[in-house]
Each structure stands twice: as C-alpha cells, then as structure tokens.
Amino acid sequence: MATEAALAVEDRLHRLLRHLGVDQAHFAGWLAQDWSGLVTKCPQVVSSLILVNTFDRRFVEPVSGKLLVITGDRGPAAEKVRNAMRGVPGVQHVELSDYDIFPWSVIAGERTREFTDAMLEFLSRFTAPGSANSVPLPEGEGKVAGISYRIRGVGPPLVLLPLFLTPSQWEPLIPALSERYCTITLGGAALGAVAILEARGHAIGYLEMVRNLIEKADLRSGEAVLEVGCGSGVLARWLARRTAGGNRITGVDINPYLLREAKTLARQEGLETAIEFRDGNAEALPFADNSFEVVMSVTVIEETDADQMLAEMVLVTKPGGRVAVIARALDIGSPKNLPLSAGFKAKIEAPGFTGDVSSRGCADASLYRRVQQAGLTQVKMLPQLAAFDQADPTVLQFLEGALLPKLNEEEVREWQTARAEAEAMGIFYMTWPHHCAVGTKP
C-alpha cells in the first residue's frame, strides 16, 4: 500500500469521498492537477464538473455533456480557453462580462452574483435520477489523506477544489451554494496553488536560484529577514532550517488562504516559533520603517504595482540592508529538452509564450532599472533559468498545463511523443526563466 506522501491526488480524493460516505459528487475547481486524475480514472464519481478559467482537452472526454467552463470575456487566459475548447462537444461556456481573470483575481468576491448564478443554473440540470443524491453530512471540518475539508449545507454534495491563487477562494459563494448543496471545501498541501508552491520550493533547480539570491544578499547570523508574498511559506521554512534559528524570519502575504496553509505547514514541521506569518499587502507593508536587514520576494512582483512594492520593501529595510527580488521573465526564452521539430521547438521556447503579468507588474528586465530607481545601490543583476526534470512531476504538470492548451492537436501529439522519448532516455526537462536582483539601501 502506498504511503500517504506517495498517494496520487485522485487516490487522496477517493479516500476522502469514501470516508464521508459519498459515492458521487459535483466538482468545481481550476488546476488540472486537482481534477484530471479523478475525471479520467474515476469518472463514475463525477456527477458534473465546473472549471474556472481553464480547459484541457486531454482530460474532459469522460465529462462531456456535464461540463461548465467559466472565464472572463477578455485577456489572454480567456482567449487560450476559447482556442482549447474549439471543436470539443458537450461543453457549456459562461463568460463574465468585461473581466480578465488572472490566477490571483478575487473572482468569487468581485463577481459573486454572476459566478453563483452560473454555477446554480448549470447544477440545476443534474437533478434527475443518476445525479448526485443528497447526503446527510454534519457540518464541520476534518482531514483525510492529507486533504483538509469543511462541510456546509445540506443537499447533493458539491466538492470545491482550490481556486488557484484567489485570496477569497470560494468563501463569498458558500452561503448561496450551501442553501441547495452540501458544499465540501477542500485544501491542504496536496491541492491547488499550495501543491505547486511546495513542489517548486523543494525542486533542486529552483532552490539553487533562491540559494544564489540569498548568498548575493549576504545574509548574516542575527539579521532579521522579511519575505514579502511568502505564499505557503515553503521558502521561509527552508530558510529557517538553513539558518538553524540564527535569524528572525517573518513572512507576509495578502492571501488568507495561503497564510492558513503556511501556518499549518510550519506547525507540522515544528517551525511555528521560528517564523512569524503576518497578513499584509506588498504595496503597504505593515511594518515600521527600517525594521529588517534583508527583505526578499520571490515571483510576487508580477502580480502587484511593481514600483510601489519596491518602494515599500526599501522603506522597511534598514540602512545598509539588502533588498532581494526574483521575477518571472516573460522576455527570456524557456528551453525544453526533448526531440521536437525545429519550428515547433522555436515556437514553444519563445519568450512570453506562456505566463501572466498584471498591468502594473514586472516580469522582464525592467526589474533592474526599477530596483535602481527605488534608490538601491550596488545592484547585482542575475537572470537565471530554473530547471525542472522528472523528479519534479507536480511542477512539470503545471508548466505543461500552461503550454498544451495553446497548441493544436498535431502539436500536442508531437509533444507527447517527444516527451515520452526524452523521459525514456532520462533527459527530459523544462525551464522557467527569471530575473533576480539584489541591491543595498544607502
């Protein structure tokens, strides 16, 4: 029998459903890594599926005719979904008007009524025999197979998988949904953005980049460290172990969902006293001026007002302290090691082929200019590639999930054949380009 740590997501979900006595349920989610295994391997438990801002034609055939996709009506994500859905039968598509959805958008809070109405109208179609039946589950919380759950309401079970990086997650929708359905909201380190952040933060190729950043920041024993946008806390925990308690470490994030998971994971690893997690906005940090010797941030500046965030980071850094920032790089190509035709390889390795950046965010070499304009000196500029191989399946699945929906069927087949060949030879990897900068506050 597989250990819990080795369980696939679909096996974890199946154990959870058995524990709750649920044979069949409606599901709603975002990331394919959360729902694809269940849909393809255990389709009999899926009464219907609602996807938010995503579509992957590789996995949806088992739910044809009972699939709803909700997107905005503008922006690259909506266009990618439209292209991926083209020619696929049995899919209902609802577009939220005048809306561009990013991974960090507060979709359930900003479009509560439209989002709720779309879900309820779709779910109302599945009340005939054979759909998910009402289950008398008591309201409460628990954890099974590494997945946390919270139950609200009475009715047919509706399993709510994490909404990527959305701060509010499903909370604004729960009151209305739980009037008609037994909502089962899921979390934990095995699902959603937390699973990706944790896997990425343990990958050798990624940690080498972060380790290089810390070394260039010249962190010394006794210095106070702030991580802005700490997410699940995976890097804060890594730093706490690396420094063995020699530094006061604080993590701040605006996302309550990620902060809850960060505190839980730190407690599970016995690091709850080594790291302080705080709620706070990167554009208005809740700390006094000159509070930390080192202020760092990793792949957050793409999602904020970049210049305002840098100004805040400098403000809370002590004179002589260092500010260290990593941004995803949409202006650098991303090499992939597998035998593809030259034209196809050039297409998918081109700068900016995948990735997101907000209107005021920074995901290019302007990071170095911005850091200097923020008043930092002795700026070190470190463009780097983080590589992920077969030892990093969760990150590879995420990167592949961003790539494949932008390809046509012939290209997908070529990719899958080439990947299988490269994996058989043990040479497959994908890369994620970044810009890294370290500067000193005068």
Feature-to-residue mapping (PLM):
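A short acidic, Gly/Pro-enriched loop at the edge of an enzyme's catalytic core
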Residues: E283-V294
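A short glycine-rich, Lys/Arg-flanked "PGG" loop and its adjoining helix->strand segment in the class I
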Residues: D307-R322
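Catalytic active-site module of serine/aspartate enzymes centered on a nucleophile-bearing elbow/loop
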Residues: E95-P138
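Conserved alpha-helix/loop element of class I SAM-dependent methyltransferases that forms part
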Residues: G205-E223, W238
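Class I SAM-dependent methyltransferase SAM/SAH-binding core
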Residues: A224-L226, S232-A284
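Conserved HGGG/HGGXW glycine-rich cap/lid loop of the alpha/beta-hydrolase fold
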Residues: I151-G192, G205, L239, E303
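Conserved catalytic/acceptor-binding region of the Class I
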Residues: R322-A391
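Conserved Class I S-adenosyl-L-methionine
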Residues: A365, Q378-P442
